[in-house]
Amino acid sequence: MNKVRGNRIFNYFWSVSFFLVALFETVNAQPYNSERYSKVMWNYLEVLSEFGPRYVETEGYEKTLRLIKRVGGEFADEVLEHTFFVKQHDGGQRQMVNIEFIFNGNAEGRPILLGAHYDTRPFADQESNPVLQTHPITGSNDGGSGTSVLLGLAQYLKEYPIKQPVRLLFFDGEDFGQSGSGEMFLGSKYHADFLRKESREKWPQAVIIVDMVGDKDLEIFKETYSMASGPKILDRIYNVAKRMNSFQFNEKSKYTIQDDHLPFAGLGIPSVVLIDFDYPYWHKLSDTLDKCSPESLSVVFSVLVGVLLEW
């Protein structure tokens, strides 16, 4: 699972340089400092990891909400809070919230939605020790990496506005319940239900979810639900990655994964997830910052920027 690749640092800087040259030749884009954005995203991931567990009603959760809303207030054209309630087994309710950043662009048409969950697993259910299974995880990669990439994109979209309308959506409750309980992907399910009540003209034309994209040994295969729902989106993404000479994007299919893209795919919206599921620390207490890499965040960020510019 934990594959080793040689000469990673050289390959990373060569791939980013190759990508930028190719991108500026094919797209009327302004050059940007990729190293700067890499540091920005890594700083966010450091902060999120320092917050500790970030599931609803924890201190880390509240700090994360404040961070996301502060970044949105600084960079987005508008910030929306979508509050919803989850029924508890004791008959009570628990409040959760999705945060949406709106970037209007200057072109007509439906927006592109990029999403990530910001919550973390309340229990380490993949630990072999039953005692450890009751402890909450830090979730540096699972919950932290996707959030950090979206926060970095928010700054980019402010500093280099693009014509395409974009929504950045931070989901609550993705990792809340036991597997198979129906108490997972709560934020994305809520937003899909919210869209059902809206005019289809307001629906996103495409959904791209980023999840677990920060690990040091990053390799993103094509996920099978994504291939069924959004094959053309995957083609866009992997074509950009190919020009970028990014070995982190593998065009083969490997996993079938339930994630935040499925509620939108259920509406008929082309939806995909970018995820590296070959991560031995998934839902374990060892999902910590030292397992992550700023290079991985930067590669995913650069590919997403390229996709947005070419849309």
Descriptions of predicted regions:
Residues N2-W14:
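Bacterial N-terminal signal peptides that target proteins for export
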Residues A206, V213-W311:
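Active-site-adjacent substrate-binding region
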Residues R54-V56, F85-H89, G105-E108, Y118-P122, ...:
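Solvent-exposed loop/turn segments at secondary-structure junctions
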Residues W14-E25:
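Bacterial N-terminal signal peptides
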Residues N43-N106:
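A non-catalytic alpha/beta surface segment that caps or lines the substrate-entry region
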Residues E100, P111-G115, R167-F170, Q205-D211, ...:
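Structural recognition of the beta-strand scaffold that forms the well-ordered cores
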Residues T134-R236, T256, H261:
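Acidic/histidine-rich catalytic neighborhood of metal-dependent amide-processing enzymes
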Residues P31-E35, E50-G60, V86-H89, L132-G143, ...:
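Second-shell loop/turn segments in exported
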